[in-house]
């Protein structure tokens, strides 16, 4: 087994959390605490030292999520999401899960710190993993292929959401090998079913759903 040294996560500090909070947008999860509210609590100078202390505490939680196996009952509220029903063209309903803003802040800070690890793990197969100009390069490459008179091709558009079809346990097992520094954080986040709240009922998600 690959041993991950917790010291690598020391870069996640109050400043990293503040930068992450400044780049978060959108509504809140079950607590309804949206991005603007968290941004104000963490980044506003009006709160003085309390904002810095909050950033430090969130950073400490982030580092624990990256380096320790935390009992799920201790973080189940953080991993919960609020379901919003979206009406589709065929009049059916598609549930979209809105996760807690705090979880998104932590995730962004962790991903930012492990950017190079994620880039190495995903390679050229995933242009959305942080590779600069990756999507633009892919578009230009396809254009060159189509404009080549010697080329005959058909492009098949993958319109399905791969995250919805993902087997969590298999994915976590693979991540442990190809990106070990990220494994514990993802394991704490996705090993257990997430509570999904919608109106007056709550159900448990055993398969992935869309997260905002």
Please give the residue ranges for each predicted region:
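Conserved pre-catalytic core of RNA-dependent polymerases
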Residues: 3-212
